[in-house]
A protein has these predicted regions:
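Symmetry-related core transmembrane helices of the 12-TM Major Facilitator Superfamily/SLC fold
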Residues: 171-193, 391-407
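Helix-loop junctions on the cytosolic side of multi-pass membrane transporters
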Residues: 180-209, 407-417
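Helix-loop boundary and gating motifs at the non-cytosolic
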Residues: 2-60, 93, 229-278
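Transmembrane alpha-helix termini and helix-breaking/packing motifs in multi-pass membrane transporters
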Residues: 35, 39, 92, 151-177, ...
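Conserved MFS/SLC helix-loop-helix module at the cytosolic interface between two early adjacent transmembrane helices
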Residues: 58-97
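C-terminal transmembrane bundle of multi-pass solute transporters/carriers
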Residues: 3, 50, 54, 59-67, ...
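Juxtamembrane intracellular "pre-TM" segments in multi-pass secondary transporters
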Residues: 1-12, 194-234
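Cytoplasmic helix-loop-helix junction between adjacent transmembrane helices
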Residues: 106-148
Length: 419
């Protein structure tokens, strides 16, 4: 039986469903992952090195896997990605040494390399094939809101699981990992059912020759980024943001654990905190169309990045858990608004669908590279000085990228001024 034809609205709905299912398992992990690793005996510096294992894998694989998605299809690559995440989650349940935890994060690095880009690229290309004027910024704004809700639900559920400890004999911090494992399996089923894509592998060439195209696709994408001031500015901004993000994702939970002097209690607090943060992030994403109607996307992106850096400095200066929690929620709300702006500028700057996933991967690569560098350097700085000094340093690095959005926004506006 031939399935009914897709419309722009149905593609958007599928995109949003798949986006929510992609991030729901992550919501279960965010409140516990740092605390679980620290509970198993690692120092902040060792935590940074374990995170760096993920960054190293991304550094090696991000561009080739983006090219792979452009060559063999986005759906295939997403399914392979989910397999690596399932393996990582399974190992995380029992991993209790730095080498095993490094393997866990390396597997997640493979997952993130494969996963970054294909879904967005599938949506943009499918929607534009149906309607060249499809409003992709509105879809990315809605995607940010859905992501916030999914992460919020996952964080609340993880907090409840840790607080109630329903499985006797299993560490309370491990139970959300089990839930994430089940939900990732649901995500796989949804990708199979909802992501309709024409095969990019021609019958007369086959998979081997399709894969052989990957190096040429990667080289072409890199040339495109180098030749475009918009794309170059955006990927550099992403690198600086990735370094600064370490202060939010890795160092803020560690600071909260120190202030509360109890990792389990910190995990219980982080659950509802993350829930609120991700809901606020979703709200931030939802107001992006209003912001960009009043000011240029480049200007909005610059101011949001500066505001986010300011809130991270506030986290460093905060002395109590309530202030840390409030500023963390505000930081995530600003991030929820800034990401759709960045993604909209990025996709508008990509002219060829043939290299879209690869260029999106290049952007993701710089962010992951930044996070890897931040994990090592800021982790070492925290061990050598203090958590607060490391958090402030991350915020300052994040702020340096703000003017680059003005470059991206200005160059985007120039062609229309001459029409």
């Amino acid at each position: 039986m031939t399935p009914p034809p897709l419309s722009v609205d149905s593609v958007r709905r599928r995109f949003l469903i798949l986006r929510g299912l992609r991030w729901l398992p992550t919501g279960f992990l965010i409140p516990v992952i740092v605390l679980l690793v620290l509970e198993r005996g690692l120092s902040i510096g060792q935590l940074g090195l374990v995170f760096a294992a993920q960054g190293l894998v991304v550094l090696v694989l991000e561009l080739p896997t983006g090219g792979l998605a452009d060559a063999v299809g986005r759906r295939r690559v997403l399914l392979v990605a989910a397999g690596f995440d399932l393996a990582a989650l399974t190992l995380l349940i029992v991993a209790d040494t730095p080498p095993l935890l490094a393997v866990v994060f390396a597997l997640q690095g493979v997952y993130r390399s494969l996963e970054s880009g294909p879904l967005d690229s599938w949506y943009v290309d499918t929607a534009r094939a149906l309607d060249p004027d499809a409003n992709i910024e509105a879809a990315f704004s809605a995607s940010g809101a859905v992501t916030g809700v999914a992460l919020s639900l996952g964080s609340v559920a993880a907090s409840v699981l840790v607080a109630t400890d329903p499985l006797a004999g299993i560490d309370a911090l491990v139970i959300p990992v089990l839930a994430a494992l089940v939900l990732r399996t649901v995500d796989v089923i949804a990708v199979i059912a909802l992501m309709r894509e024409e095969s990019r592998i021609k019958r007369d060439t086959g998979l081997r020759l399709a894969v052989a195209k990957v190096p040429a696709l990667v080289a072409s994408a890199l040339r495109t980024v180098r030749a475009s001031r918009v794309l170059a500015a955006l990927v550099i901004a992403e690198l600086l943001w990735g370094i600064g993000l370490t202060a939010v994702e890795a160092l803020t939970p560690a600071k909260l654990g120190d202030v509360l002097e109890d990792f389990d209690r910190a995990a219980a607090v982080l659950g509802p905190t993350n829930a609120g943060a991700f809901l606020v992030a979703g709200g931030g994403a939802a107001v992006v169309p209003l912001l960009t109607r009043r000011r240029s996307a480049g200007s909005v992106g610059a101011w949001l990045r500066l505001a986010q850096a300011a809130t991270v400095v506030g986290i460093a200066l905060a002395g109590g858990p309530a202030a840390i929690v409030g500023l963390y929620v505000l930081t995530m709300g600003i991030h929820g608004a800034s990401d759709p702006v960045h993604q909209g500028l990025l996709h508008r700057g990509i002219e060829s669908a043939d290299s879209r996933a690869t260029i999106v991967s290049a952007n993701s690569l710089t962010g992951q590279t930044g996070f890897m560098l931040g994990s090592v350097l800021l982790g070492r700085l925290a061990d050598g000085t203090s958590l607060n000094a490391a958090i402030v340093t991350g915020a300052l690095i994040m702020a340096v990228g703000a003017p680059l959005y003005l470059v991206a926004g200005r160059d985007r506006a120039e062609p229309s001024q001459g029409v």
